[in-house]
């Protein structure tokens, strides 16, 4: 590894978030990483918005809460959230027995993990390229 690469790696080092439901968050994260293309936006601000909006709407769906569909962006995120919530209910049956508070905590932990993996912990320099 060159000195410049090592310097960039040290500069970008961010600690992974720790959460009491880490094992379950790992399962949900693994599903997203293998099945969801929305995680691959080329700019960090796109990834931040996607993670926040899709996972917020997924939480609302899992908790049986109303979902804002007032804008075209909201509806776009909602479509991904519906697919994700349905898949989580099918593939991870334990999610169906969680309380709203547990689901909210789980989904916040998942969002924090996704932000770390796709944005703050990523060494992809294109994420912060202003000309990209």
From Swiss-Prot:
UniProt cofactor(s): iron-sulfur cluster
This protein's UniProt keywords: ATP-binding, Iron, Iron-sulfur, Metal-binding, Nitrogen fixation, Nucleotide-binding, Oxidoreductase
Source species, domain of life: Bacteria
EC number: 1.18.6.1
Alphabetized InterPro entries for the sequence: Nase_Fe-Fe_dsu, V/Nase_d_su
Keyword Iron-sulfur: yes
One annotated GO molecular function: ATP binding
The reaction(s) this protein catalyses: N2 + 8 reduced [2Fe-2S]-[ferredoxin] + 16 ATP + 16 H2O = H2 + 8 oxidized [2Fe-2S]-[ferredoxin] + 2 NH4(+) + 16 ADP + 16 phosphate + 6 H(+)
Any Gene Ontology biological process: nitrogen fixation
Function as written in the Swiss-Prot or TrEMBL entry: The key enzymatic reactions in nitrogen fixation are catalyzed by the nitrogenase complex, which has 2 components: the iron protein (component 2) and a component 1 which is either a molybdenum-iron protein, a vanadium-iron, or an iron-iron protein.
Record note on quaternary structure: Hexamer of two alpha, two beta, and two delta chains.
Entry protein name: Nitrogenase iron-iron protein delta chain
Record lineage: Bacteria, Pseudomonadati, Pseudomonadota, Gammaproteobacteria, Pseudomonadales
